[in-house]
Amino acid sequence: MSTAPAVAVTAPRRLVDGRERVTLNTAYVRALESAGLVPLAVPTMLGADRAGAAVAAVRGLVLTGGEDVAPARYGAVPHPRLGDIDPVRDAAELALIAAARARRLPILAICRGIQILNVALGGTLYQDLDSERPGSVPHSDATARHPVRVEAGSLLERTLGTRSATVNSRHHQAIRDLAPGLRAVAWADDGVIEGAEPADASEAWIVAVQWHPEDLAERALFDGFARAVA
């Protein structure tokens, strides 16, 4: 009997009933399990010096959604509408990204994940789309859906199997300046970057999206990640 590959999934800390707990949205677990993977929660309060050990035990890395990335990480001052930040999580995920890339592990970056990946590689973020990009489509409405356009021939297009998709949208931040090591491969109608991947095609499999595929019926991204992990 073959063994299902294990992947690391970042699990943030939350205050629940007055106690600090490590949490993981079960939608990630279900989506990864349905793709034939074993999700292993990696607490984002993990010391940055433990990142290498964390990724040594797995075949891939999933960067999950959550808080805003601290503006200090990309040389900006806090915007008045900046949301909650967790500098400890930032440090842990930056170290996990570096360790995973050093081992050429596949990375699937979701929502905050695309943002921290962009920051890790030298990019910057819009701290609040509504105020910094007036007229943008509603990106922070949990019930909203909007179309995205996917670049032909991109890894994302090959993974999704389509050049267009309708996605959910639960973010108020987004990529401003794209990191030198990434290229944009999906956009909302307002031009906001919704997908990115390595600019160098020889790099390991990395797909980053601004939406939450774990909450959609379509599982192509997780299936593509599983193929890369295998």
Task: Show which residues each predicted segment covers.
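N-terminal beta1-alpha1 cap of cysteine-dependent amidohydrolase-like domains
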Residues: 1-108, 118-119, 126, 130-160, ...
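Conserved G/P- and acidic residue-centered "switch" motifs that form tight phosphate/ATP-binding loops
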Residues: 111
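The feature captures the ABC ATPase H-loop/switch
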Residues: 114
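Active-site-proximal beta-strand elements of phosphoester/diester hydrolases
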Residues: 207-211
